[in-house]
Amino acid sequence: MIKYTLEFPIKSSVSVLFNAVSTPDGLSEWFANNVNWKGNTYTFIWDDSEEEAELLKKVNNQLIRFRWKSQDDDTFFEFKIEVDPVTNDVILLVTDFAEDKEEQENETKLWETQVHALMKRIGS
């Protein structure tokens, strides 16, 4: 598996961005058509599919990490928020895993599309 991280500058407050990447309502605005949550299980629903993810770690206004229940235990996807100490720019780091370089390229394009939708949604 290839672990990769994508970096996106986001023009938003940390709290607004964290809400968008960590809550069912926020995630359903840009990541999936609908998101349900029960305990540590998030169910992501798209037009013709549904997938469950386990919440692995959450640090308010900093990080949220999920593991797809259908995937290998060592993989996860994560949204991490950093603030540049010099410029105060807000950065969203998306970490994910791919089987090979081709899958990584395809997933990178998908993440870019998804994060663009996120930015549009929060007015970035």
Q: What residue spans do the PLM features occupy?
A:
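Well-ordered beta-strand positions
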Residues: 9, 45, 56-57, 82-84
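Beta-strand/loop substructures that line and gate deep hydrophobic ligand-binding cavities in soluble
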Residues: 67-120, 124
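Short, intrinsically disordered, mixed-charge
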Residues: 19-29, 61, 112-120, 124
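Glycine-rich portal/gate segments that line the openings of hydrophobic small-molecule binding cavities
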Residues: 25-76
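Hydrophobic ligand-binding cavity/cleft-lining segments
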Residues: 1-34
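Charge-dense, helix-prone N-terminal extensions
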Residues: 1, 15, 28, 42, ...
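Conserved short-loop catalytic and cofactor-binding motifs
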Residues: 5, 43, 99
